[in-house]
Amino acid sequence: MQILVYDNLDEKQKEEALKRPAISAKDEISKIVSSIIKEVQEKGDKALIEQALKFDKAEISKIKITQEEITQASNRLDKDLQEAILVAYENIKKFHEAQIPHEIALETTKGVKCEVLTRPIEKVGLYIPGGLAPLFSTVLMLAIPAKIAGCEKIVLASPAKINDAVLFCAKLCGVDEIYQMGGAGAIAALTYGTQSVLKVDKIFGPGNAFVTEAKRQVSSDINGAAIDMQAGPSEVLVIADDLANEKFVASDLLSQAEHGADSQVILVCLSQDFAKKASDEVQSQLELLPRKELASKSIANSRIIIAKDLNQALEISNLYAPEHLIIQTQNPRELLKGVKHAGSVFLGAYSPESMGDYASGTNHVLPTYGLTKTHSSLGLADFSKRMTVQELSKEGFLALGKSVEILAQNEHLDAHKNAVTFRLESLK
């Protein structure tokens, strides 16, 4: 890993040190995705079946998974894995139930009652990628809050053949329908509906460049679907002092690096000595990983930054605004006060990112690419929307009437003014 001393860098070099890999969609990907979306709109299920063979090398005759198939998958699943999933399920459920909003009702002026009500999004679609490492944990992260929020219909899509653990988690969380379809075609089907697939209002879940581009395209279509967030490559920034355990730090860096070659890991520490120890430990652990080749590409593009003190380390972290922030210092909670931007924060030696990824209870769907400056981690609020209510008595109307007439008149909105004036005259 490249080691940089922050105070030795000029402003341009500092900016370069915290630069992320480019994620702009290539024109070729955009065109392919547009073509796939159009194909699904025109041919429905037939297009999805053809795409399963073309892209996933899967021969299927139907899109919707039956209850019998779900039961069989659950029966095949290793019992230890089932129990581990149940532990995660309970913690995620507890944490998201605590986010249930309270209704707000108050009088702003005597006789003027204002309220905030929360209502669930009716139909949501959850996308779970396939591949060698099926993200069944993401089913929990998406379906549990959807269920707690009260969404009327929760459907899930994943490429054929769907992993048994994905089906087990979907059943556990009360997902209504499961579709074996993947990629941009799945996003199109969830957006516009097909003979078998329910058209949804909002789509959640990660994916490759084609899925990400498909989500971008459908979310910009007035007849399309809303999406959770635009996803970039996964990332972690670790702040460590000289007393941190370099073995723990290295394992945290590598647990992020193994996600993919474009994942970014940054260590901010306080000395050359610790930087060297951590870098050596990363190389030692890397050699033993099954996904060594993938992780090594990420590590090659990652860096260690030496800060003069913890205040500067925080400054660097806030400039970067990481998806995951791990603080391995003697008093991590003290540093938390200065954290301005992060998707999820992990405090102390025994809070590895893996805990949040799976079972602590927090959600692992997080904004990336610096979006933590303006966006939040996924939560219950993402599966619902708020509406305001106002109710004025005659007394309340009279109390505000004259002021609203003046405000409307000065904005030259005569009909607005008349709506008040006519009522005031009727009360004389």
Curated annotation (Swiss-Prot):
Zn(2+) binds at Q256, H259, D357, H416. Binds 1 zinc ion per subunit. Keywords: Amino-acid biosynthesis, Histidine biosynthesis, Metal-binding, NAD, Oxidoreductase, Zinc. GO terms for biological process: L-histidine biosynthetic process. It catalyses: L-histidinol + 2 NAD(+) + H2O = L-histidine + 2 NADH + 3 H(+). It is an enzyme of class 1 (oxidoreductase). It comes from the Bacteria. Pathway: Amino-acid biosynthesis; L-histidine biosynthesis; L-histidine from 5-phospho-alpha-D-ribose 1-diphosphate: step 9/9. Gene3D superfamilies: 1.20.5.1300, Nitrogenase molybdenum iron protein domain. Its cofactor is Zn(2+). GO terms for cellular component: cytosol. The active site is at E323 (proton acceptor), H324 (proton acceptor). Its EC number is 1.1.1.23. PROSITE patterns: HISOL_DEHYDROGENASE (PS00611). Belongs to the histidinol dehydrogenase family. Catalyzes the sequential NAD-dependent oxidations of L-histidinol to L-histidinaldehyde and then to L-histidine. This is Histidinol dehydrogenase. It comes from Campylobacter jejuni subsp. jejuni serotype O:2 (strain ATCC 700819 / NCTC 11168).
